Amino acid sequence: TLGGLPLIIWALRALEEIDDITEMVPVFKSEEMAEGLDLIGRYGITKVKQVVPGGKERQDSVYNGLSSLDTKTDIVVIHDGVRPLVEKSLIKEAIRQIDDADGVIAAVPVKDTIKTVRAENIVQETLDRKSLWAVQTPQVFKYPLLTEAYRKAVSERFYSTDDSAIMERYG
């Protein structure tokens, strides 16, 4: 919890306040579905139309959520419920920019020094952090393109920790 509220409620409230978001489909672990529904009702989150059980990996959970949406959906905003302090202005700006792109991601420049390491834990290379960004959520995509990219990833058993990486590969 944060300030007495569950983290997921902070995230859902931020999304709920965005006029361009008309429907939300939270994805919960199967064993947390009842608790999730209870929280949504208790805290008056009205844009949730359904909740969906997650999968083994994050990618499976996102795919389950995407698969539950109406095929007439235009865009999707993917946000991790463990990022409770998302700024509404960031969500709005990402949605605004999707008209000119297939996807829009939130990211911050890397401040740490990043190294690649061989299997024996021996440093192989130091990467130039000027060209590195840490990707976060929200991530906004055109629904048909992201859904097709996810279908291809599933069929090829390609796994990534990030939705934009799936779009890079298949979108």
Protein language model regions, located:
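Short, high-confidence coil segments that cap the C-terminus of an alpha-helix
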Residues: 21, 45, 73-74, 100-103
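Residue-level signal for inorganic ion chemistry
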Residues: 8, 65, 79-80, 109, ...
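N-terminal glycine-rich phosphate-binding loop and ensuing alpha1 helix
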Residues: 1-34
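Short active-site oxyanion
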Residues: 21-25, 49, 102, 152-154
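Short phosphate-binding loop-to-helix
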Residues: 41-75
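Conserved core of the sugar-phosphate nucleotidyltransferase
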Residues: 85-170
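Structural beta-sheet core signal
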Residues: 25-26, 78, 103-106
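Hydrophobic C-terminal alpha-helix "anchor/cap" residues
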Residues: 12-16, 40, 69
